[in-house]
Amino acid sequence: MSAPFHDFGHAEILDAEAIGQPGARRFRIFVRSPRGAASLWVERDQLETLMAAIEKVLAQTSGVMTLRAEAQANPTPPPGAPDDFPSDPDVEFQVGPMQLGYDEDDEELLLRATPLELIEEDGELYARDSDEPTFSVFFSRSQAQQFCSSVNSLTLLGRPRCPFCGGPMQGRHFCEKQNGFHPPNLN
């Protein structure tokens, strides 16, 4: 049986926030539309990939390349979810694959998200992508630009990334590409 599909129509609010301290943060995309509120929980890499895809779509559809500041002395965190955003949204799930589309006629972007399903086999818990997207929302170009700005600020406030392997640098950082050493996998 497939999960219900949640078509949120046009977003009134679409943004991202990080909850917790760097190294132990959770990221979410929060959406509010006339059809309800949604919290889509994502990994940092998913958020960065979505930001890059949105920026690419915006650049390709405007004919103008938008440059983003990569470094700021003291980046300010985005405001996060508004105070009146429900603590128990209508839709909430951990996101697996996402799809990004663009409606040329209305000049809007479309985000579709598929949840991860937790499956237990032989006493082990596994995450598996669902077969079909179960969430969609349209958002404007200006909302897309604001979303990318928020994601950029969030990632700048987190742990720095290794320029060689892209992994988070905190404490002892083992980088196979930098020094040829990778700690043994003891699991």
What are these regions (language model features)?
Residues 1-187:
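Positively charged, low-complexity terminal tracts
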